[in-house]
Structure formats: structure tokens, C-alpha cells
């Protein structure tokens, strides 16, 4: 499941690698993003919850009944598992840069941009332009107005989307093994925010895998690097090994 504003094409090589490892891999675009963008975003009435309740749910139904269903979620993609049609059927989930977006989960320096971004900047720009110009501001692709506004509102709630939507019971249905990658140079998913997400999946079998670029001989990884092919022999192999082991357990 993709991150906010990131098209499925970004994950194509990682998905192909998983297919080489004998997984059936499906990628998709949320409405308003990538190949699911249809016309002027200013006419879109999409909300962020629709990305999970409608788009991810459609991908889920497309896969049909399978003995082992695993999810790889990047950022928002790992936050939304409790909104899937039957979250109790997830066998395992691998999360990359996924976090609770509540602004206070950031360290002091991070709060200096998270608070104004989520309380003022993002809502104001989305309302003024009728969409959020993420492509011009370095935040992936442009976002529909409703997506940007709902995302900002979740970031102002102490329990993020789970509290804002009142879906605690649905998230308690996630019993899967979950591995969350907390990457030391990821400014969009600091460790505290990653661990706060674990609290939103109270019945999951959660583990946090902390990774520093130096550990794998890299200069940087950041929020988006995990899915780069240069990490095929390190992060990709390790994550696929974990998914295989999780499916067997």
C-alpha cells in the first residue's frame, strides 16, 4: 500500500523482486494519484479515508481468497491496515516509514515544521488552490483538497486517524505479525512516531527494526530510499526473508 502522493510505479521494482521470491505482488494507485488521476484535481471529492476504504479495499477484493495475505505498507500505507475490509485476515505486514502522524510525536526540531504545516500551511494552501501542490513543494504528487485537509486534521489528533475516525475496534482486529522499519535518517518517521503507531495496533505482534544507513554501507536511506534497487541485496533481501518466515509461522 503506497505512501501519500507516491505512485505505484515507484514500487514496481520491489514488487518484481517479491515476485521473484514467489510472492504474488499487486501494486495500485490511490484515486487522484498516478494512473488513478482523472482530470483536474480541483474537481475531486476524495478524502484520505477513501484511499483505504475504497481503493485499498478494491485491491483486497481483487486478490480474492488466499491462504496467506501479506501487506507491504509505506508511510500511510502502513497506517491504514485497520480500514481494510477484513483486517483479521492479514497474516503479516511489513511497514516502511509508517508512523502515527500526530505532530507531538516528532522531536522538538521536527515540531517546528510539523505544527505549522498541519495547523496552518497545508490546510490553507489546499483551501486556497483547491488542491495541495505536493509536486511543487517536494511532497510527492499533488493531492486532492479533501485528502490534504483530512490528513492535516488527523495530524492534530493525539491518536491520529484511529482517534479521529473512531475506528479503535477495527484496529484491534489486526492480529498479524508486523515488522516496522524505523530508519534513523527518516525525518518523516522518527522513532517515537513509529512506536506510537504500534499503540494503534494493540493486538498485533509488533516488532520495530531500527536501521541506520551506516549499518548497510549506505550514505542515506531516508523516507523513500528503501524501495530503491540499490538496496536489493540488503533491505530487500532481509525484508523478503522476514515475510517468508512470517508466512510460515
Label the model's feature ranges.
Residues 72-158:
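Alpha/beta-hydrolase-fold enzymes
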Residues 211-249:
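Catalytic active-site module of serine/aspartate enzymes centered on a nucleophile-bearing elbow/loop
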Residues 154-170, 176:
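Active-site nucleophile elbow and catalytic-triad environment of alpha/beta-hydrolase enzymes
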Residues 190-200:
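Short alpha-helix in the alpha/beta-hydrolase fold that links the catalytic acid
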Residues 2-7:
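Active-site glycine-rich loops that stabilize anionic/oxyanionic intermediates
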Residues 174, 180-182:
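Short beta-strand/loop motif that positions the catalytic acidic residue
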Residues 45-64:
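Alpha/beta-hydrolase active-site loop
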Residues 8-40:
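Conserved alpha/beta-hydrolase
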Amino acid at each position: 500500500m503506497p505512501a501519500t502522493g507516491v505512485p505505484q510505479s515507484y514500487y514496481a521494482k520491489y514488487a518484481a523482486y517479491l515476485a521473484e521470491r514467489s510472492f504474488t505482488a499487486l501494486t495500485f494507485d490511490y484515486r487522484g494519484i498516478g494512473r488513478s488521476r482523472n482530470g483536474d484535481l480541483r474537481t475531486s471529492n476524495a478524502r484520505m479515508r477513501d484511499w483505504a476504504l475504497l481503493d485499498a479495499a478494491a485491491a483486497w477484493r481483487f486478490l480474492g481468497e488466499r491462504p496467506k495475505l501479506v501487506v507491504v505498507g509505506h508511510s500511510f500505507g502502513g497506517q491504514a491496515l485497520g480500514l481494510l475490509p477484513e483486517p483479521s485476515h492479514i497474516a503479516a505486514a511489513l511497514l516502511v516509514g509508517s508512523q502515527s502522524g500526530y505532530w507531538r510525536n516528532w522531536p522538538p526540531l521536527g515540531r517546528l515544521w510539523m505544527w505549522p504545516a498541519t495547523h496552518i500551511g497545508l490546510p490553507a494552501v489546499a483551501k486556497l488552490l483547491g488542491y495541495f501542490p505536493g509536486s511543487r513543494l517536494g511532497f510527492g504528487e499533488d493531492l486532492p483538497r479533501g485528502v490534504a485537509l483530512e490528513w492535516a486534521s488527523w495530524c492534530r489528533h493525539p491518536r491520529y486517524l484511529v482517534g479521529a475516525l473512531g475506528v479503535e475496534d477495527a484496529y484491534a482486529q489486526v492480529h498479524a505479525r508486523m515488522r516496522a522499519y524505523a530508519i534513523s535518517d527518516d525525518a518523516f518517521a522518527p522513532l517515537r512516531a513509529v512506536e506510537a503507531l504500534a499503540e494503534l495496533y494493540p493486538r498485533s505482534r509488533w516488532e520495530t527494526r531500527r536501521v541506520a544507513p551506516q549499518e548497510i554501507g549506505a550514505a542515506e536511506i531516508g523516507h523513500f530510499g528503501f524501495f530503491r534497487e540499490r538496496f536489493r541485496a540488503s533491505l530487500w533481501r532481509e525484508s523478503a526473508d522476514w515475510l517468508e518466515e512470517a508466512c510460515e509461522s
